[in-house]
């Protein structure tokens, strides 16, 4: 965001001044909890960035955004290398068939050698190719760039093209990335801004717009997230997969009353959006995360689901049944919770991923309802 001029200075999550981690819980903890949208532009490409949580307890929040991605940027710490959660994210990207760009950060720290890290990454996937080289605080393109791409593709036609021409066209590389024949990997330091320009140049050169031919089709979209704004308005966050959507259009029996394009916590309203755009709409009171709306019915099942069930209780002076009606909206925003009422025991049941999610949910309920819930040990 800083490199493309969206921000005048780079934010740091531990300083609480990032554009996207604007929720108070995110700023106080220094982690991303909720996925956020930002708009930026490179010389050739307008990009919508969806920033997602990296903590394992919020994997379901991350997975919801995978349903609407054209490309993913997977950030890996050079110090931590490939962790168990990295493998989970990788599996999800494979499940959703999403083309991936890798960015290995913290290369400026001692003992982080690109050759060692690249070898470990290529043991993980032989499709990974270094698209930049990090040496003593600078980034450049390697001399065997095209050869590495051709070898990783394992495609005889591409190998022959390289042998004959000594290079590969941007269009050829675009196709290989889109078809997941290769996975470009960039190296640098996000904190110091090293290598970020190389990644942006790669996104500019090697991504394609698949929606230009779909704007005239009947409107169809995917709902990937439900939230409520500070005034309680219900927002359906959607990716327009085809066609055009305008304010006052009817979807089923509901009318779109507003279309918002968010940039961090701020937004602008627009009259119309077309295929390929991500936006938030008001007026949709029944659509749920994962739904296809309009002329789009593809409805993927979530791969990540919590497996631990918890019982929520409150102070004796608080009606648990009443609290259930107040917090039921959370189930729309976080469907992985599977919030339910147990009539025989008159308790609230919920599914959660881990202790950090419990802490966040406790704070959410306190903020919205003014009471503090108690969770049992789970089963």
What is the role of each PLM region?
Residues 1-379:
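Structural and coupling elements of P-loop NTPases
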């Amino acid at each position: 965001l800083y490199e493309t001029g969206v921000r005048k200075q780079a934010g740091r999550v531990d300083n609480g001044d990032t554009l996207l981690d604007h929720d108070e819980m995110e700023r106080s903890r220094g982690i991303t909890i909720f996925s956020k949208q930002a708009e930026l532009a490179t010389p050739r490409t307008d990009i919508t960035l969806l920033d997602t949580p990296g903590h394992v307890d919020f994997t379901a929040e991350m997975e919801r955004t995978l349903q609407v991605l054209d490309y993913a940027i997977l950030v890996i710490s050079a110090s931590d290398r490939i962790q168990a959660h990295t493998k989970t994210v990788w599996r999800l990207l494979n499940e959703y068939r999403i083309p991936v760009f890798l960015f290995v950060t913290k290369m400026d720290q001692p003992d982080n050698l690109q050759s060692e890290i690249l070898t470990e990454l290529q043991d993980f996937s032989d499709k990974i190719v270094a698209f930049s080289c990090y040496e003593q605080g600078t980034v450049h393109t390697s001399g065997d760039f095209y050869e590495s791409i051709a070898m990783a593709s394992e495609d005889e036609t591409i190998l022959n093209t390289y042998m004959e021409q000594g290079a590969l066209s941007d269009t050829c590389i675009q196709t290989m990335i889109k078809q997941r024949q290769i996975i470009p990997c960039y190296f640098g330091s996000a904190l110091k801004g090293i290598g970020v320009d190389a990644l942006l140049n790669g996104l500019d050169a090697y991504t394609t717009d698949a929606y230009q031919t779909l704007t005239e089709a009947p409107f169809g979209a995917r709902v990937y997230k439900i939230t409520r704004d500070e005034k309680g308005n219900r927002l359906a966050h959607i990716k327009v997969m085809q066609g055009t959507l305008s304010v006052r259009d009817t979807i089923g029996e509901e009318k779109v009353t507003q279309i918002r394009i968010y940039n961090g916590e701020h937004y602008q309203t627009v009259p119309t959006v077309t295929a390929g755009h991500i936006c938030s709409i008001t007026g949709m009171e029944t659509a749920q995360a994962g739904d296809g709306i309009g002329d789009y019915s593809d409805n993927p099942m979530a791969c990540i689901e919590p497996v631990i069930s918890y019982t929520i209780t409150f102070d004796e002076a608080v009606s648990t049944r009443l609290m259930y009606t107040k917090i039921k909206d959370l189930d729309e925003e976080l469907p992985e919770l599977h919030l339910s009422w147990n009539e025989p025991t008159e308790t609230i049941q919920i599914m959660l991923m881990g202790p950090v999610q419990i802490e966040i949910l406790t704070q959410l309920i306190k903020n919205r309802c003014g009471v503090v819930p108690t969770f049992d040990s789970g089963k």
